[in-house]
Amino acid sequence: MKILVTGGAGFIGSHLVDRLVQEGYDVVVADNLSTGKRKNINRAANFYKVDIQGSGLDRVFRKERPTMVMHLAAQM
């Protein structure tokens, strides 16, 4: 199963990504890195630097075709 995690470079998102990778899922991360850090993202995950408010996320969906989305992206 392929899972897209928005906000996967943040504290909670990166820990979720690590766990999903550990469990054997194919993980895709979409994050604009406004508060998260690239170094937080598990190397086994496909990473896209993209703002979820823009059309860039559409390209991620078309290319990766995730089965599930876990939405953790937010601006505070």
Predicted regions: what they are:
Residues 1-76:
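N-terminal Rossmann-like NAD(P)+-binding domain of SDR-like oxidoreductases, especially those catalyzing
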